[in-house]
Amino acid sequence: MAKVNIKPLEDKLLVQIVEAETTTASGLVIPDTAKEKPQEATVVAVGPGRTDENGKRVPMDVAEGDVVIFSKYGGTEIKYAGEEYLILSQRDVLAVVEK
C-alpha cells in the first residue's frame, strides 16, 4: 500500500476497498452483476478525530493499516493518482478485523 498525499479531516478515514472474491470455493466464476458491493477495506489515512463540546479531540478508534468492515452505503468514492478510494466517517465503520 503506497503512501497517499490525502489527509482526512475531523473523524474521516481514507480507505481502499479489499476486492471481493471472483470465484466460489468450488471454482465457479461469480459474474459482476451477482457480486455484492464490498464492505471491507484497508485504512490508508486517518483524520485527527472530531472535536467534542469542550474543544478536545476525541481519538479515533482505527489506525492506518487496519482492515475495517463498513456500512454498505457509507462513504464517498474518489479517484486519486489512478487509484480508487472511499472517504468514510468513523461512524460508518462497523468493525475492525482482528489479525
From Swiss-Prot:
The keyword Metal-binding does not apply. GO terms for biological process: chaperone cofactor-dependent protein refolding. PROSITE patterns: CHAPERONINS_CPN10. GO terms for cellular component: cytoplasm. Transmembrane segments: none annotated. It comes from the Bacteria. InterPro entries: Chaperonin_GroES, Chaperonin_GroES_sf, Chaprnonin_Cpn10_CS, GroES-like_sf. Its main location: cytoplasm. SUPFAM superfamilies: GroES-like. Keywords: Chaperone, Cytoplasm. PANTHER family: 10 KDA HEAT SHOCK PROTEIN, CO-CHAPERONIN GROES. Heptamer of 7 subunits arranged in a ring. Interacts with the chaperonin GroEL. This is Co-chaperonin GroES. The lineage of its organism: Bacteria, Bacillati, Actinomycetota, Actinomycetes, Mycobacteriales. The gene is groES.
